[in-house]
């Protein structure tokens, strides 16, 4: 309960080792003394919380929830409910003396010690029977000492009258005088103590049931989370075992393949095989040597990768990032983009010269923007941006017409001034300047309105950008799949071309060894060719026995 205890409880699990008694402080492990209730409904002794507040906020030692505290003490108010429970459950050794015989009676003997409310004095059991047996004491109000301590709160502190009613509106006990002082509409909410007690018990029972249901649901959720943690651990162990098994099997397969390759390399060929295939091997080696080879590396040793851009591109869908349009602002000038060039809004204190205004007419919308807007409006899609474009075109045409009107008037004045060397219509100069200021204010208002829609359109554009990014990713994956199929087909074609000579050779030898596979000869003109083939193939049986083991190795 000392203010020097500042050991932090690491989460709710720290309560497992402490006492689960509801009247014991989780910090000092002693009975509450002036318990204080925090906003997170955790309670601690006032002494345990003293000195923990910082900047008007008090962090809960259990869950770190911030509670706003007021006053110089830096402590929340004392919890009257828990304080009552602590006082009611106390087993103190308060000693009272009998007013007649001075017999000491402890508070634990409150049920066998009495108190006379009429006399205002405590009495032991023997003196109660001896002194208050007479008829003159028959009207004295004698109650047990414990009952007297509980009856102290049964009288109004304002009027010293016993409580008879309870206000369900203000949640307070009322005596008869408090009831009389209340307004008429407030008396409707007053009920007798017995009815209020029954209603309070029912509501308390309902609240207890709700808390028990919450405890049950919380316990089930904790069990579910624990089961899920066990499943995650078991799944991780199974995945690790699967990876280890796959790695071991891969090592075994690679070892077997290594042994087979080494055996094939280390096998010796006989002289016939060497004479039959050696020169072909030499020709291949000579061809390999004569082919151009790049003996120097074409790349440098420095590794450069666009990993930052790749990371940024991967994080864009998660952080809802998209192409941002930078809005430039400087001084008192605002730049409007979307025309042939920047349009500058100047304040009333800096009017543009007449010559510059005549030399820089109001720029009309670009052909690209006009055509794009017309196409967008012609599509008929109902979207916020379409409605904005439709409203913008109307406002822009109106402002453009006003600017053209002012331009014509100023050009006419300028023409009169240059021709006649005098200002013919001086009275309309003020009107033109006033209208120009009004148009300037309208343009600024329209610009602010359009600029205010940036956040709405930016969110819509970000969604569209995410969809386009997903489509691009799918498109690139499709191209990659097609390239992979093309590469596999190239490998297949190469392998087929490599094994074609061997298959044809085996087929010819098989035709010579098995006459039933031979094609019947119908035309006599083929006999000379067949005679030549017999001479060529006469040596085939002798070569088959020599080539067959080598070809089997090659095919395998």
UniProtKB/Swiss-Prot annotation:
It comes from the Eukaryota. One of its GO terms (biological process) is regulation of heart looping. A zinc finger (RING-type) spans 25-64. Residues 524-535 have a biased composition (Basic and acidic residues). Its main location: cytoplasm. The gene is RNF207. GO terms for cellular component: perinuclear region of cytoplasm. It comes from Bos taurus. Zn(2+) binds at residues 98, 101, 127, 132. Keywords: Coiled coil, Cytoplasm, Metal-binding, Zinc, Zinc-finger. This is RING finger protein 207. GO terms for molecular function: Hsp70 protein binding; transmembrane transporter binding; zinc ion binding. PANTHER family: RING FINGER PROTEIN 207. Residues 517-556 are annotated as: Disordered. It is found in: Cytoplasm.
């Amino acid at each position: 309960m000392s203010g020097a205890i500042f050991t932090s409880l690491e989460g709710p699990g720290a309560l497992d080792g402490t006492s689960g008694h509801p009247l014991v402080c989780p910090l000092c492990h002693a009975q509450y003394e002036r318990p204080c209730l925090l906003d997170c409904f955790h309670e601690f002794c006032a002494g345990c919380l003293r000195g923990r507040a910082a900047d008007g906020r008090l962090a809960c030692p259990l869950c770190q929830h911030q509670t706003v505290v007021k006053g110089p003490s830096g402590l929340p108010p004392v919890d009257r409910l828990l304080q009552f429970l602590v006082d009611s459950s106390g087993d103190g050794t308060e000693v009272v003396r009998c007013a007649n015989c001075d017999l000491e009676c402890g508070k634990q003997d409150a049920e066998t010690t009495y108190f006379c409310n009429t006399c205002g004095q405590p009495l032991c059991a023997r003196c109660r029977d001896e002194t208050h047996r007479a008829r003159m004491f028959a009207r004295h109000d004698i109650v047990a000492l414990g009952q007297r301590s509980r009856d102290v709160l049964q009288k109004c502190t304002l009027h010293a009258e016993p409580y008879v009613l309870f206000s369900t509106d203000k949640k307070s006990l009322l005596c008869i005088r408090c009831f009389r002082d209340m307004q008429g509409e407030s008396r409707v909410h007053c009920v007798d103590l017995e009815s209020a007690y029954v209603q309070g018990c029912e509501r308390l029972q309902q609240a207890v049931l709700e808390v028990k249901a919450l405890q049950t649901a919380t316990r089930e959720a904790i069990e579910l989370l624990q089961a899920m943690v066990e499943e995650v651990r078991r799944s991780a162990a199974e995945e690790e075992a699967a990876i280890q098994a796959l790695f071991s099997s891969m090592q075994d397969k690679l070892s077997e393949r290594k042994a087979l390759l080494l055996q094939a390399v280390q096998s010796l060929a006989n002289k016939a095989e060497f004479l039959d295939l050696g020169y072909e091997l030499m020709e291949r080696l000579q061809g390999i040597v004569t082919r151009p080879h790049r003996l120097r590396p074409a790349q440098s040793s420095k590794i450069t990768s666009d990993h930052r851009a790749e990371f940024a591109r991967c994080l864009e869908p998660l952080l809802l990032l998209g192409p941002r349009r930078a809005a430039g602002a400087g001084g008192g000038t605002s730049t409007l983009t979307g025309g042939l060039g920047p349009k500058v809004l100047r304040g009333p204190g800096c009017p543009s010269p007449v010559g510059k205004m005549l030399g820089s007419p109001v720029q009309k919308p670009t052909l690209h923007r006009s055509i794009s807007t017309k196409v967008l409006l012609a599509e008929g899609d109902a979207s916020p941006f379409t409605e904005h474009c439709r409203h913008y075109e109307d406002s822009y045409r109106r402002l453009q017409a006003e600017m053209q009107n002012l331009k014509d008037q100023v050009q006419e004045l300028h023409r009169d001034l240059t021709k006649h060397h005098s200002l013919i219509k001086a009275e309309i100069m003020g009107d033109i300047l006033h209208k120009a200021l009004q148009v300037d204010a309208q343009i600024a208002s329209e610009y602010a309105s359009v600029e205010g829609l940036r956040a709405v359109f930016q969110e819509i554009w970000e969604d569209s950008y995410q969809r386009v990014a997903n489509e691009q990713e799918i498109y690139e994956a499709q191209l990659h799949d097609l390239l992979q199929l093309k590469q596999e087909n190239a490998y297949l074609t190469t392998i087929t071309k490599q094994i074609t000579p061997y298959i044809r050779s085996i087929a010819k030898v098989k035709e010579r060894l098995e006459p039933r596979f031979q094609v019947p000869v119908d035309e006599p003109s083929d006999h000379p060719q067949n005679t030549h083939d017999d001479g060529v193939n006469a040596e085939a049986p002798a070569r088959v026995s020599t080539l067959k083991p080598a070809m089997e190795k090659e095919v395998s």
